């Protein structure tokens, strides 16, 4: 996947607000871009009835909204929920999505949580990232999962606190990292 994607569908007058990164999306293409680049952040706060209503009313895609409603009500897997959105505009093939999701599913729950926190950091959601990193540090099996994981979490906590200009806490975590 390279280059650019030309918007082929209607642009919404009212955006859909993605709460966990405080971002508005105005089109199905923007939604696909967000989902593709933030797979670790996909949860019930995004894939819910509000999204289905927005897709139906603002984007005027009632068939897609109906598909998503049925998947969400059955508590389907992320793959089953996300794929119809990608398929609507041929953003990804099933195989491309499956490769990304399979890689994600092979990771341990702790590693997925770290990836989630890292994604929050990339989106400048430092307070949420700090919460996820703190929860990771409470796990007793963190070092067993991957050597050096604890130090990386401490380092990332230091970075998060430094972005929030809490230099004393940042220094504390940087020291723990090394």
Where are these regions (language model features)?
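Flexible helix-coil transition and linker loops at the boundaries of alpha-helical arrays
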Residues: 100-104, 138-148
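Long, contiguous interaction/recruitment modules in multidomain scaffold/adaptor proteins
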Residues: 1-112
């Amino acid at each position: 996947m390279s280059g650019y994607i030309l918007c082929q569908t209607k642009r919404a007058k009212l955006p859909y607000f993605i709460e966990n990164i405080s971002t508005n999306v105005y089109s199905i293409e923007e939604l696909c871009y967000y989902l593709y680049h933030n797979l670790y952040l996909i949860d019930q706060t995004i894939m819910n009835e509000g999204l289905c209503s927005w897709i139906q009313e603002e984007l005027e895609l009632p068939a897609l909204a109906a598909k998503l409603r049925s998947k969400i009500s059955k508590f389907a897997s992320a793959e089953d929920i996300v794929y119809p959105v990608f398929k609507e505009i041929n953003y990804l093939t099933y195989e491309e999505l499956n490769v990304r999701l399979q890689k994600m599913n092979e990771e341990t729950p702790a590693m997925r949580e770290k990836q989630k926190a890292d994604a929050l950091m990339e989106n400048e959601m430092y307070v949420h990232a700090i919460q996820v990193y703190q929860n990771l540090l409470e796990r007793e099996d963190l070092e067993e999962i991957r050597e050096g994981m604890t130090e990386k979490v401490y380092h990332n906590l230091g970075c998060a606190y430094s972005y929030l200009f809490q230099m004393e806490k940042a220094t504390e975590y940087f020291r723990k990292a090394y």
